[in-house]
Amino acid sequence: MKIVSYNINDSLPWKIEKLLKMGADVLVVPEITCPEDAHLPETLDMKWCGIEYFHHQKKWKGLSIIWKRGQGYITEWFNPKHDYAIPLIANDYLILGIWPTKPTDDRPKKPYPQIAQEIIQEYAPYFKEYKTLVIGDFNCYVNQYDRTKKYGDMLKVNEVLESKGLHSLYHQQTDEEFGKESILTYFHRFHESDSYFRDYAYTNFPVISFCIFPWDKEMSDHTGLEVII
């Protein structure tokens, strides 16, 4: 089973079409438009969530999981209070797509590492029941600007995930230190000189393969991730 995570930056029709041509069984897509505007083929199902952004009166920026119809389902314990986290069961695997994002409404703005850790704690009881993949744009990196003493940065998020039995595929594969990655996944305002590692895939089981796509500047300010299980 092939899982691809790709923050596509702007939800343009040609980008969605390109995603679908990747042949993934499951797509985790931050910054995608709502289902009624995505116009997916009937062979696919899509779950979309997020605080609504409006652009020409349309919801255009949320998190989605897309999967082949009949080959997965959203769990009954999906909790929409976490605006940008979706749990999918596919072939008895738990695929938790996440995109920790600060709400645009009047709620207090939590730091990204806090949002990520709250999502992890919400779904952690199910990590023991399923072979689990947590994947997406974590919006977290080492020494980020909104770190706090309590919630830290990506190092703290990683500590919490490892305490639940999950490990970063990239860091397992490369044995590189967090914050010293040789491949980066996010290019702020499309500048290579201002880049970070903030897209992650964590599992509690061995996978067949993991890779980070080369950066496609036309597609996004992020790179995509591919996991085959």
Protein language model features and the residues they cover:
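Active-site-proximal beta-strand elements of phosphoester/diester hydrolases
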Residues: 1-10, 92-105, 135
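N-terminal, active-site-proximal structural segment of metallo-dependent hydrolase catalytic domains
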Residues: 1-43, 55, 60-63
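Catalytic metal-binding/acid-base residues of hydrolase active sites
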Residues: 7-9, 33, 99-101, 138-141, ...
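Short catalytic/ligand-binding loop motif for oxyanion handling, primarily in non-cytosolic enzymes
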Residues: 12-14, 35-38, 103-106, 141-145, ...
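Structured beta-strand-rich core segments of catalytic domains in phosphoester-bond hydrolases
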Residues: 32-103
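Conserved beta strand-loop-helix elements of the APE1-like EEP
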Residues: 58-74, 90, 181, 186-209
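Metal-dependent phosphoesterases centered on the DNase I-like endonuclease/exonuclease/phosphatase
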Residues: 114-194, 198
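Surface polyanion/phosphate-binding segment centered on an Asp-His-Pro turn
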Residues: 218-229
